[in-house]
Amino acid sequence: GFAHFFEHMMFQGSKNVADEEHFKIIGEAGGTNNAYTSFDKTVYHQTAPSNLAETMLWLEADRMGTLLEGFTQKKFENQRDAVKNEKRQRYDNQPYGMVNEILFKTLYANHPYEWTPIGFVDDLDIATYEDLRNFFLRWYGPNNATVVVSGDVNPEDVKIWVEKYFGGIQKCPDVRNVYPKKPQLSMDLYVTTTDNIYAPLTMFAFPTVQEFHPDEAALDILAEIIGGGNNSI
C-alpha cells in the first residue's frame, strides 16, 4: 500500500509548492488533476489549458525532485489516517467491498497481484516515517517514470521543458523489469464468504491472456456479454 500512500503524499507540498497548492494552481486555470494507483503503476494526471503546459511539468518535477523537503511527521500521520479511512469507506464498510480482495488472494496466490493497491491497515499501522521516505527514494526518480504530454503543444518546447525541469533530478536506483510467473489453476476454485449483506453475490473469474494479447479485445466483448449490464447473460 505504500505506492497508494504516496499518491496522497504527493499533493501535500514540496520545496516550492505549498500544501494543496498543486490543486489550486491548476484549478484556478480551469484545469483538473488527480491520481490513481493500480497493481503496476501510479499515475498523476492533469488536464488544463495548453498555455499551462510548462507550469504542469514544473509542478510534477518539483514534487518528484523535492517532495521530501516538504515531508513531515505530521503530514505522514494525517495521510496515514486518510488512507485508513478511505479503505474503510470504500472497501471494509461497503456492501461487497471485500470481494476483490478475496478474489485476488485466491486467483493470484504467491504473485504480486495477491495484494490490492489500497494496502492493508495492519501494514499502515506499523509503517514509519522512515519507511515511506526510503520507499520514495527507491522508486520515485526520472529513470522510473514516463512523462506523457498531449494536446495543443509544440513537441520541441515540451522536450526543452522536460529537460529543464526533470534533467537535474537525481535518479533512483536502477529498476529491473520483473515478470513473475503467471499463476496456473489446475482445478476450479470455489470460495464462499459471509458478510452482513441481505442480497447474495456470485462472481466468476476466468484466467485468460495478458494485456495487449491479440485475443484481449474479443475477451473484453465476451465479458460484457456474459456479465456487463442489464442485458447480459
What are these regions (language model features)?
Residues 13, 47-79, 228-230:
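M16/insulysin-pitrilysin zinc metalloprotease superfamily fold
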Residues 71-81, 88, 94-104, 126, ...:
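Non-catalytic accessory/assembly modules
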Residues 53, 66, 70, 155-156, ...:
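Short beta-strands and strand-coil junctions in structured, solvent-facing domains, enriched
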Residues 16-52, 89-144, 168-213, 227-233:
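Non-catalytic beta-strand/loop surface segments
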Residues 1, 215-217:
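Zinc-dependent metallopeptidase catalytic helix centered on the HExxH motif
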Residues 2-14:
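Active-site SXXK
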Residues 73, 80, 129-165:
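Non-catalytic, conformational "gating/processing" segments within enzyme and secreted inhibitor domains
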Residues 4-6, 44, 60, 83, ...:
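Buried hydrophobic packing residues in well-ordered domains
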